[in-house]
C-alpha cells in the first residue's frame, strides 16, 4: 500500500515535489488535442465523456458501473493510488472526476490548484509525449455518500473536514 498524502487541493509546487512517487496517478481531463500539446509529466488523459451516462432525460448523470470500470481500468487506476486531477478549461471536469471517485469510494484524491494553466505559467515541467498506462482491473460500486443536499451542507458548515466540490 502506498502512503502518499496530499491535501484535497494541491499546489503545483507540492505536486512537482512528488511526481516520481509510487502510488501517484495524475489525470488530465482536457481534450486529447490539448493533452498532446502539453501536460504535467506522467499524466494520463481521460476522456470526460467516459464519466457521463447517456441516460435521457437527465443527460450528464454519472456513468454506469461497467462504463466507469472500463474508463478507470483504462487509465491504470488501482485502489491504493492517490489521484491528482486537473483540467485547463475551467469547466469543472476535474472536479466532476474527483466527485465520481468519491461516489465509488476511492477516497485518495486531490485537485491541482489552478489546473494546467497555473502549472505551466509557474514554470513547472511540461511534457508532450502521451503516457500509456498499463491497464488495471478496477471494480466500481456506486454509492450515494458523496451527494450532499442543502440540509446536509448547512448542518456541516462548521466541520473542518467537509469539502464541497460543485461538480
Residue positions per predicted region:
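Positively charged, proline/Ser/Thr-rich regional signature most characteristic
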Residues: 2-80, 154-167
Amino acid at each position: 500500500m502506498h502512503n502518499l498524502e496530499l491535501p484535497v487541493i494541491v499546489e503545483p509546487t507540492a505536486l512537482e515535489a512528488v511526481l516520481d512517487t509510487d502510488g501517484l496517478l495524475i489525470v488530465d481531463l482536457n481534450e486529447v488535442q490539448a493533452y498532446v500539446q502539453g501536460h504535467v509529466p506522467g499524466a494520463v488523459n481521460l476522456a470526460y465523456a467516459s464519466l457521463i451516462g447517456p441516460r435521457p432525460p437527465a443527460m450528464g448523470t454519472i456513468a454506469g458501473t461497467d462504463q466507469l470500470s472500463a474508463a478507470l481500468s483504462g487509465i491504470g487506476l488501482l485502489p491504493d493510488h492517490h489521484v491528482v486531477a486537473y483540467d485547463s478549461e475551467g469547466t469543472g471536469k476535474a472536479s466532476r472526476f474527483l466527485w465520481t471517485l468519491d461516489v465509488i469510494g476511492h477516497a485518495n484524491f486531490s485537485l491541482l490548484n489552478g489546473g494546467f494553466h497555473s502549472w505551466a505559467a509557474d514554470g513547472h515541467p511540461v511534457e508532450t509525449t502521451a503516457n500509456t498506462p498499463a491497464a488495471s482491473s478496477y471494480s466500481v460500486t456506486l454509492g450515494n455518500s458523496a451527494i450532499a443536499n442543502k440540509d446536509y451542507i448547512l448542518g456541516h458548515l462548521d466541520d473542518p473536514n467537509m469539502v464541497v466540490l460543485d461538480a
